[in-house]
Amino acid sequence: MLGESREEAERIVRAAREEAERIVRAAREEAERIESSSLAALSQASRNVLLSFQDSVTRSLRAIISMETAQAYDAGVLRELIPRVVSAWVQAEGDKLELILSPADLRTLEGVFCAALQEQLSAGVELRSDDCLTAGFRIVPAEGGSYYDFSAAAVAQLFSSYVSARVAEVLSLLRRSCDVFLLLPYNAATISSMRRGASFALSGFFGLCATFLGSAGCCGAWKYLVVSRAGA
């Protein structure tokens, strides 16, 4: 009787231990699943935010480039530049061409160009305006079919393409340097909660992002923080 009671007690203890181990194992597996799922979601969110940030930076830079390029094509620059360009063109390609300016620039500078390009104008160079042009100029060869675009919009697009590629390259390098990249609202609670959870380290890119976003007016009064998982 005593032996049976001891065996029953051992069986109960063994069953309880196995059940406890099963519960612990299941809890560990569930925790790992949740962690893996959370990291995957965070990584996807970080990629989405990074792409959004890249678009925002690119749009801001394009706006700046367009504004600065248009301002650079002032009357003084055109007064000096266009006679040189037209003279060089005539020597290399012939004197049958159209010089197209914005209506405002043509009104302002027509007298200047008529004096500076008198010989070329008498030989076949024509001046005209195009309402679609806001700054800069275009040269249209006599045979037509194509034109050489030195308008502010075309030059700005050229610079913007280069800048867009450089922004993408820089952010791509940054993204590859850490497995989690995220712009977060910056406050004490955010920092505290991150330090209590998975180990995070502040990125040195924070200053650049916060400064640029603030100056570009993309986030108003918010400050943003770039974080990467520690050891990444």
From Swiss-Prot:
GO terms for biological process: ATP biosynthetic process; proton transmembrane transport. Keywords: ATP synthesis, Hydrogen ion transport, Ion transport, Transport. It comes from the Bacteria. Produces ATP from ADP in the presence of a proton gradient across the membrane. Belongs to the V-ATPase E subunit family. This is V-type ATP synthase subunit E. The gene is atpE.
